[in-house]
Amino acid sequence: MTTNYIFVTGGVVSSLGKGIAAASLAAILEARGLKVTIMKLDPYINVDPGTMSPTQHGEVFVTDDGAETDLDLGHYERFIRTRMSRRNNFTTGRIYSEVLRKERRGDYLGATIQVIPHITNAIKERIIEGGEGHDVVLVEIGGTVGDIESLPFLEAIRQMAVDVGREHTMYMHLTLVPYMAAAGEVKTKPTQHSVKELLSIGIQPDVLICRSDRAVPANERAKIALFCNVPEKAVISLKDVDSIYKIPGMLKSQGLDDYICKRFSLNAPEANLQEWEQVIYQEANPGGEVNIGMVGKYVELPDAYKSVIEALKHGGLKNRVTVNIKLIDSQDVETRGVELLKDLDAILIPGGFGYRGVEGKLMTAQYARENNIPYLGICLGMQVALMEFARNVAHMEGANSTEFVPDCKYPVVALITEWRDEEGNVEQRSEQSDLGGTMRLGSQQCQLTDGSLVRQLYGSDTIVERHRHRYEVNNMLLKQIEAAGLRVAGRSGDDQLVEIVEIPNHPWFVACQFHPEFTSTPRDGHPLFSGFVKAASEYQKRLAK
């Protein structure tokens, strides 16, 4: 199989939507029966985004194999069926650390290590490895052309045309075409300068995606084609839309997929976008709306919860309702009280790390439990639900997590290496033990309890979901909590860890240790989010009676 490469770069400004554009194009090519994958190359020096601030970088998207990656990989998985892995995302820091490790081992036989060829070769090797077994690989280069950090990646993708052949490589450049209200026209000069910058690096773009708040007129596209040395049919207008799921159809309507298939000599049938048309129809024709509050600590940057927000929208699609998401800072709940939670049809507490805002989340979980409001807790959202239930229902005063209070009387949540035996003694587990010593990452099997709500929602005894956490339910204190009315609805495949809890006498109260948002897609949804949004609709109807 010959693999073809489409390299996606951005110019003029950041946040043009390279990831969405790449994912949308991949969706069309996949709909033509081609085997497609997408890679994201990030120019920052962090080895991975795992320890980066969510309010700076956005969410960390976790893959099946446990890689902590850029949030764009979430977009990729929501648009195409191919599952991402650690091969689909790497950073400057990762490349440099690998090259330096090889140098220390003597792999380079005393050679002087340089950006060219050693760093660029390492980048190219990663790209080729990530694309194995696919007809088309889209490679998104993070940042903006002209950034000093991006230069090694841009040089590497320039060399790819030499290594694999120009007939198997394409360069797609996203650029801004701003509308000037005073002049009453769009301006192409920023695009011309951006392409000039790219040409100075040695890359001639084959396709230009022109981002604007309105359609770029044909005469302006012709002008761009002339000055940028690109065929007119390869100058694509991509205006702002109210739904990102309209973008595959917009690209297809301008013949971009035909142009690419012809360029790569790919004999593929016409794309069938019926599934995407169905998604767009569902989104545009809701039968109602629900208000769901998400109480977190990173709400100043919604991208910190990107997959959760999208999963809630997918749940709305499956129930034919619009989901209005109210982002609430958990610290505001601490200072201003649960009045902030009024007029909500459901409440969700997502994952997070650290003590800041935890008391507000505990107040939120208590409010949802006592007022029979549908509740979905994810990761830390499950842990605070457990802590709140232990304190206020199981009479375990001061119940807490060892993440926040290491020497608390009732450590109902503890580090994976910290477990209490039957006598109450702390049992230490090292990295050599079965459960490992740090973060639990990636897909893990979960056995669902017969008769539980989640068993009904999933329609299966066994599920696989993705994890990202260091703390787990302390089994030694579980019996007392269960006796007070909490039900364990799911356990790990080895029956050692609690994965899901429910409150049976509550209309809809589910909390899970894993992250179901990472596997939700607009076409398929996710059982937990579909059930959660349905419960919100039913709660709203009960109140209206």
Swiss-Prot record:
Allosterically activated by GTP, when glutamine is the substrate; GTP has no effect on the reaction when ammonia is the substrate. The allosteric effector GTP functions by stabilizing the protein conformation that binds the tetrahedral intermediate(s) formed during glutamine hydrolysis. Inhibited by the product CTP, via allosteric rather than competitive inhibition. GO terms for molecular function: ATP binding; CTP synthase activity; glutaminase activity; identical protein binding; metal ion binding. InterPro entries: Class_I_gatase-like (IPR029062), CTP_synthase (IPR004468), CTP_synthase_N (IPR017456), GATASE (IPR017926), GATase1_CTP_Synthase (IPR033828), P-loop_NTPase (IPR027417). The keyword Ligase applies. CDD domains: CTPS_N, GATase1_CTP_Synthase. Mg(2+) binds at residues 72, 140. It catalyses: UTP + L-glutamine + ATP + H2O = CTP + L-glutamate + ADP + phosphate + 2 H(+); L-glutamine + H2O = L-glutamate + NH4(+); UTP + NH4(+) + ATP = CTP + ADP + phosphate + 2 H(+). CTP binds at residues 14, 147-149, 187-192, 223. Pathway: Pyrimidine metabolism; CTP biosynthesis via de novo pathway; CTP from UDP: step 2/2. UTP binds at residues 14, 187-192, 223. Residues 1-266 are annotated as: Amidoligase domain. Keywords: ATP-binding, Glutamine amidotransferase, Ligase, Magnesium, Metal-binding, Nucleotide-binding, Pyrimidine biosynthesis. The active site is at 379 (nucleophile), 515, 517. GO terms for cellular component: cytosol. ATP binds at residues 15-20, 72, 239-241. Belongs to the CTP synthase family. This is CTP synthase. It comes from Erwinia tasmaniensis (strain DSM 17950 / CFBP 7177 / CIP 109463 / NCPPB 4357 / Et1/99). The lineage of its organism: Bacteria, Pseudomonadati, Pseudomonadota, Gammaproteobacteria, Enterobacterales. The gene is pyrG.
